[in-house]
């Protein structure tokens, strides 16, 4: 299970660009900037409880499971929001097991496994990767890559009263412009974006999180009574930011490489019953892109691809003849579940969407041959080495 952390406070602190972009007052959070909120912890415990009930109902674990050493693994990026997410989930899933959360970096530092950084970079690679990113804008490339966000930008500006903000009036912030986006790719750094998309993403992120956290939806939108479709429109800027930076084939194969290796190792680990890896939306998005996931839609979600607290679940099943099959699902809580904090009864599932992958065939039960699924993960991890080998060659742009 590859998880995105649950609800957190916005990444920016008081006095930041986020504050300067609106004359309105953001809500008071129950946690410090970037940290898991109390609501996020409660929701994550519920996700753990659902997982426990589901596994028990399938006969995969006994009630009040206390796993022997090596049977389960909880590994999180060393940020507060990811460690806390893993801790709350483990409390819900294994309430009497007192699970330790494994980290491999100093506290509050990014673990290389969960850091979506380009660890191989060359002039030829950057040129090819930027060409793929620009292709998201169609024939005109990077100039129009954000053209589809015009309505999202306009709604964000209206909701936060952007032109009445301190930053806009002082000239520090400019009107959101869909044509000023620039992407940079550097060695051992995360892909970065400059221009209006960065500002729009920060505002969309804070607004959507505030919508999840605040009791009153109108207050969350600074007095605007927004429809579900309008909240989705706001989220488009944030969602596209993740797509733009992390899901182009050459970029996904690069930034997801260490996590794909980790997932493969967990699936091969002898005796492992359950693994929980906790990271970020960029991790889930880049892994799905590297695995060549087909397009999908998420019912009852504001965020279109990797909603808060979502889990990418890799499952292995066997029939009476010992044949093994695989299934991959994206598990997430609906907007109502996030906002209301409601626990679903019994083994009723949160929202669940089955993933499909290009070039792989499902059987009549909607399952893949396990060997085919495992081979796809191995092939996606190996794509990194192929990119390195093809560096400088004409076919680099087709390597991924």
Regions found by a protein language model. Give the residues of each.
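Signature for phosphate-centric chemistry
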Residues: 1-71, 77-275, 279-400
